[in-house]
Amino acid sequence: MGNQLAEGARIAAATKGAELVISDDRCDAEGGREAAEHFVRENVRIVTGFLCPDALEAALPVLAAGNIAIVASGVSEPTLTERRAPAPMAVFRLATGLDKETQATGSFLGSLWRAQAFAVIDDGTIEGRERAARVLASLKEQQLQPVFTDTYRPGLDNQNALVARLRRAGATHVYVGGERDDIAAIGASAAALNHPLTIAGGSLLDAAPGAQPLSQGTLMIAPVRPQDLSTAKPAIDALHQAAKLADAYAIIGYASAEIAADAILRADEKKQPVLDTLRTGSFETVLGTIKFDDNGIRTDNPNRLQRFDGKRFVLADK
C-alpha cells in the first residue's frame, strides 16, 4: 500500500512540477521517526503519507519541531500525541474516520427507515459496539426507536439463531456493527429462513470477500472507492500512462501530493505560512474539493449510501 501511495504522489508531483522526497516509514515507530528526521534534513515543507498510526505518532514531535505540516493519507483517528496537545497540531487528514461515517449512517438510515421496524446489533468488539452505539444514538435523536438490539456471536458460519430472534422481534431491517463475513452469514441465514431482511453496515464491508457472498441489496455507508470517483480520471489516466495500477492508494497518494504542491505554491504567492494556507484554503483534487477545518478534519463528508448489486457496491438512490 505504501508503494502505491508513493507511486501516486510521484506522478502528481511530476504533473505539478513539484520536488518530491520519499522515505519509507516501515509502518512502525522507529521508521516514522527516521523518515521525519530525513525530511527535516531535506528541508521538506509538507509531508504527505502515513498509513500507520505508530509511524505518524513517532514522526509528529520531529516534524512539529521543524514546523512541518502533515497531510495524512490514511490515519483517520487522532494519535495520542494529538489528543494530549493543548492546541490542534499541523495534521490534515484525508481519511475521515468513524465520526463522519456514523453521522452519515444515522442520516441515511433515519430517512430510509423512518417507517420500518429496525434493529441495531453489534459483534461485541470495541469497534463494533462503538459503531452500533453511535448509529443508535443518532436514530434515537431523530425519534426513531429500534424494535430489537443485541450483541451477536461473531465468526459463525450461520446466524440462524440471531435471524430467528430478529424475526420474532418483527425486525425487517438491521444495522450491523460488525465484519463483512458476519454480515454475509446473517444475509444467508435470512434467506435460508425465508425472512426478508434489509441489512446495512459500514466501511468494514469494504473488505475482501469471504467464503459466503453478501446478499444482494446489502447497504454500506462508506466513502466511494477513489478509483470510482468521477474526479479521479486525471489520476487514473496519468497512472495508466506511466504503466502503473490505478488503485485506491495510488489515487489517494496523488491527491495528497496535489494538496501539498498547491498549498506551497499559494503560500509562496501570498507570502504566508504553509500552515495558514492548509487551514484556510480549498483544494481541487482527484478526490474532489477538499477543505480542512481548524482541527485538520475534512469539512465535507465523503460517506455515501451504497448498495451491493451481487458483484460490487454501487451508489444507491435514496
Regions found by a protein language model. Give the residues of each.
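Extracytosolic ligand-binding ectodomains
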Residues: M1-K318
